[in-house]
Regions:
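PAS and PAS-like sensory/regulatory domains
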Residues: 32-36, 101, 119, 173-175
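Nucleotide second-messenger and two-component phosphorelay signaling modules
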Residues: 26-29, 66, 98, 110, ...
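PAS/PAS-like sensory domains
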Residues: 19, 70, 98-104, 172
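Active-site core of bacterial EAL-family cyclic-dinucleotide phosphodiesterase domains
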Residues: 84-141, 178
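Catalytic core of bacterial c-di-GMP phosphodiesterases, primarily the EAL and HD-GYP domains
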Residues: 13, 81, 111-120, 145-194
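Output-coupling edge of small sensory domains
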Residues: 23, 41, 106-108, 124, ...
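Cyclic-dinucleotide signaling modules
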Residues: 1-86, 90
Length: 194
């Protein structure tokens, strides 16, 4: 977008476009809505070269998807955030095979007796390439990239092994596992618990 136009004009145009594209339309008996995201860059403020402007617009589009908003204006630093997300998504593909994941248990204590009754399973990732990657960073990207199913499968398998080990030791403790919305909506979810 040319920087001689006002940001107010652009904001109004984007809102008009959003209103138009967000209006449901019919095909046969079904209503449909278009999903879209817009990345905003300014010439020359965000770059003078076409390739750079296009890349920054694409980065802004990806950021708008992450923020679940229909448009994001490019800001300094988005390139680095975008590259970090790509590295995480790429590294996640091998995290299970490379044995970079581990479980951490948050104890559950009976307040009346003070006895241990179980634990909540928390997933942690120590990447050889990226170092420690927090679950607040990698889980949303796993959901977006489709890698969450493999992570959930791994967590369930490892949790089952832990429960089996406790059972063999005569312990009757419970484990709680956090599931993603993606997992809850999956037809494969019941298969995890067979």
């Amino acid at each position: 977008y040319a920087s001689d136009k006002s940001e107010f004009d652009l904001d109004n145009k984007i809102k008009e476009l959003h209103s138009f594209l967000d209006t449901p339309f019919k095909v046969g008996d079904s209503d449909y809505r278009l999903a879209f995201n817009i990345g905003v860059v300014y010439f020359p403020g965000h770059g003078n070269e076409v390739d750079l402007l296009i890349r920054r617009a694409q980065v802004s589009v990806q950021q708008s998807k992450l923020q679940k908003s229909f448009y994001v204006e490019y800001k300094s630093g988005l390139d680095e955030q975008y590259m970090r997300r790509l590295q995480i998504i790429e590294s996640l593909k091998d995290a299970v095979a490379d044995k970079e994941l581990h479980l951490v248990l948050q104890p559950k204590i009976n307040c009346q007796t003070g006895s241990l009754v179980g634990a909540e399973v928390l997933l942690r990732w120590q990447s050889d390439k990226l170092g420690f990657v927090g679950p607040d960073e990698f889980i949303p990207l796993a959901e977006q990239s489709g890698a969450i199913t493999e992570l959930t499968n791994w967590v369930c398998r490892e949790s089952a092994k832990l429960l089996q080990s406790w059972h063999e030791q005569g312990r009757t403790l419970k484990l709680s596992i956090n599931l993603s919305t993606v997992d809850l909506l999956s037809d494969a979810l019941p298969l995890l618990f067979e």
